[in-house]
């Protein structure tokens, strides 16, 4: 995965480049945004092959790297935030990296491998994981976990409480029916991309000790990479990480009877691969291999319309 920050413009429509930052000797694999509540400075939190970078993009025409944390080499490194902390997963055996963003020297961070629950005595450990999501309640969902130390963590979703203690998250439970590649959560519902079964899963996570699958639907190209729910909660959008695949749109107003309502490609026949799609109001913003970034108007999810792109 390469970052829009470092792409040279080949063609565009309704999107324009504001600035670039080049790490020269490495490549990017994920990006997330964070706004400092103290002064509203804006930062790009970037997963790189060789570590984690925090870039000040308050002036987008002149981005400045604030700090870099070196880590084990990996093609996969994903970032999310809770409060003033960044949480970073990787498929290298580096555990969960927690970075204190109050310290812009980059010297305050932890690599956590073991997660306990003092109240229940339950625990889990992992050394690697593919991705993560943190919901509005401060619950962190670890996806695709694995271990090289003999433990056997859930590779579906592990639930951690980062709100109570951001630097020492407590283990709450897990869902382990299928491997989850990526997902997002709103309220008590997890929308999961189960890439190896090619299905969107909808999971009730209100009881972290007993999560329950409440809906499931195959995606167009049977390699479900990510899922993101609409603001009104009635629709979900998915990507399949394979050549010439579609973005899918689904009516989930009744999760026991999910209906596909539309699908759309970026550039049919080009072997372009959709990676992640995210909802922004009435639009979805999608990153692609080969085709850069696209924006679709999904005010009518039954008829998604591409309205912008940048490559």
Predicted regions span which residues?
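Feature marking well-ordered beta-strand scaffolds used for ligand recognition
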Residues: 9-311
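Sec-dependent, cleavable N-terminal signal peptides
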Residues: 1-10
């Amino acid at each position: 995965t390469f970052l829009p920050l470092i792409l040279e413009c080949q063609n565009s429509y309704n999107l324009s480049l504001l600035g670039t930052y080049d790490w020269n000797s490495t490549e990017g694999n994920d990006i997330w945004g964070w706004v400092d509540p103290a002064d509203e400075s804006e930062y790009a939190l970037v997963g790189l092959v060789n570590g984690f970078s925090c870039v000040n993009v308050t002036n987008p025409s002149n981005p400045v790297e604030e700090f870099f944390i070196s880590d084990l080499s990996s093609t996969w490194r994903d970032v999310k935030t809770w409060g003033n902390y960044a949480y970073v997963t990787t498929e290298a055996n580096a555990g969960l990296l927690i970075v204190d963003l109050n310290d812009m020297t980059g010297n305050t961070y932890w690599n956590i491998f073991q997660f306990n629950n003092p109240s229940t005595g339950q625990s889990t450990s992992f050394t690697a994981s593919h991705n993560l999501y943190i919901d509005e309640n401060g619950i962190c969902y670890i996806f695709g976990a694995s271990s090289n130390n003999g433990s056997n963590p859930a590779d579906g979703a592990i639930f951690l409480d980062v709100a109570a203690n951001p630097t020492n998250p407590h283990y709450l439970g897990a869902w382990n029916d299928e491997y989850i590649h990526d997902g997002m959560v709103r309220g008590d519902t997890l929308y999961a991309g189960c890439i190896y079964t090619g299905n969107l899963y909808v999971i009730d996570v209100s009881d972290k000790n007993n999560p329950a699958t409440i809906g499931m639907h195959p995606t167009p190209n049977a390699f479900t990479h990510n899922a993101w729910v609409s603001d009104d909660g009635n629709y979900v959008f998915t990507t399949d990480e394979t050549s010439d695949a579609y973005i899918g749109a689904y009516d989930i107003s009744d999760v026991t009877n999910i209906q596909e309502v539309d699908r759309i490609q970026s550039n049919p026949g080009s072997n372009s691969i959709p990676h992640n799609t995210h909802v922004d109001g009435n639009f979805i913003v999608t990153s692609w291999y080969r085709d850069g970034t696209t924006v679709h108007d999904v005010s009518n999810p039954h008829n998604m319309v591409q309205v912008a792109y940048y490559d």
